[in-house]
């Protein structure tokens, strides 16, 4: 119970601390937002004060200009044409209207654009810098009278232009030596067949040796009678048939995948005496020192499982006829020899994988 109370107190304390922290952050942000809201009001007030001061200054300047303009009218009657361009201050009488609205002060700027007419005044001196005025033929229509003056100056550079084609003539002579160089690549084509001779060396396809690398082996074991004895043919043929062997090709017995004699051959059984064949009709009267069981690897299915079935068949026949199981050298079968057979089978499987 005490532990539960401690856990509850710890959880409640943690929740209270988190609530205090959240409340503190919320209040601080609220204060900051109120401070930022007050600032734009102060800025607006300061801007309003500045705008009022500017209006007052503009009004003062407008009054001053009115006093100056009557002084300019006196020289205007005295000097005449020399002071004609000074008429621009007449447009400055508009500042009194700025007291009511400051926006008409801006349209005064386009009124100052009449300096464009003085650009047309230099039209008479353009006759001398006619070459410079050439890029602006579209603006000056009276230039058709000037073209007869320009051809007098242009024939001089025209005389220099025929000098330029003179260096072009030697360039035409250069391709002539290039023509004898073109037959040079022809002997190169003749040298290419010499290089093509080693090409027949490239078709080296060692694909043929790959099937030769396929390893094969034959596992052999014997079922023989004891020293100085022989196996009875009638008992032997009965044990062979009970082991699942069927008489077939090459006049020997074969163990098929299925005991009824169907399917691929797993291993075979032959007579130990040459030529190694059997005669089923006279086999009951036959006597033999033993039989040989052999399996070719690789074979159908799992070779290790086929080897176990082969060993079981040999032991069954040996028990039925009263013989022993021997290895390929006709020695007693040992566990070491069996492992050797299995290693040979694995080696062939790995090589052919």
Swiss-Prot record:
Key word rRNA processing present: no
Segments traversing the membrane: 7-27
Predominant localisation class: membrane
Subcellular location: Cell inner membrane
Signal peptide location: none
Pfam families attached to this UniProt entry: ZipA_C (PF04354)
Record-linked InterPro entries: Cell_div_ZipA (IPR011919), ZipA_FtsZ-bd_C (IPR007449), ZipA_FtsZ-bd_C_sf (IPR036765)
Subunit structure: Interacts with FtsZ via their C-terminal domains.
Free-text function comment from the UniProt entry: Essential cell division protein that stabilizes the FtsZ protofilaments by cross-linking them and that serves as a cytoplasmic membrane anchor for the Z ring. Also required for the recruitment to the septal ring of downstream cell division proteins.
Protein name: Cell division protein ZipA
